[in-house]
Design a protein with these regions (language model features):
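Acceptor/aglycone-binding surface of glycosyltransferases and processive sugar-polymer synthases
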Residues: 3-23, 27-29, 39-116, 142-159
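The conserved acidic donor/metal-binding loop of glycosyltransferases
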Residues: 32-36
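Hydrophobic helical membrane-anchoring modules
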Residues: 88, 112-175
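A generic structural signal for short, solvent-exposed coil/turn residues
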Residues: 1, 83, 130-132
Length: 175
């Protein structure tokens, strides 16, 4: 699946979910394209779906934070807290782009964000649908030779916060 033009992370995820539904996929795995994650760890994210009937497995970068740049650590922790305000989630790393999804998750998850807010929105949708979410510790490589996201951390954070506010407003509309 490839868009001719970069339409955003959420748009790419939306295309993947649509393709997975149309293909009747049993499991899909998402991995950010910035080179931070190790594809050889994909089996770690698939195993809980197959053996424990988990619906979503999130790669957890926070069990080993010593390598994470301080600005990322602060930003991710902040976004984790905001995401957990929208829906009760027992997840340490809500912003990880290394995940696996079961067939049930593929069918039930709904999201509208075309940008980076999709990661939070997907977990919020999963919680609303009572899907079982777990985490697996993963290895992260932060020095990827400039391949990491070029998005400004402040605009990235703002985009995610706006997406979460939309989800909170849908859950608790003004009367």
């Amino acid at each position: 699946i490839k868009h001719q033009k970069n339409l955003g992370k959420g748009a790419a995820l939306k295309s993947l979910f649509e393709f997975a539904k149309a293909s009747n996929a049993d499991i899909i795995v998402t991995i950010d394209a910035d080179g931070q994650f190790i594809p050889k760890e994909i089996p770690k994210l698939i195993k809980p779906i197959i053996e424990e009937n988990v619906n979503i497995v999130v790669g957890n970068r926070f069990d080993d934070e010593k390598e994470m740049p301080k600005y990322r650590k602060i930003g991710n922790k902040f976004l984790d807290r905001i995401t957990k305000l929208a829906e009760e989630l027992n997840i340490k790393d809500t912003q990880s782009g290394f995940r696996s999804y079961s067939k049930i998750a593929i069918e039930k998850i709904e999201f509208t964000s075309t940008g980076f807010g999709a990661d939070s929105e997907i977990l919020i949708s999963a919680a609303k649908n009572n899907l079982k979410i777990s985490e697996e510790k993963i290895t992260v490589i932060y020095n990827t030779g400039g391949r990491t996201s070029t998005k400004n951390p402040i605009s990235h954070t703002s985009e995610v916060i706006l997406s979460i506010i939309e989800q909170i407003a849908l859950k608790h509309p003004l009367k």
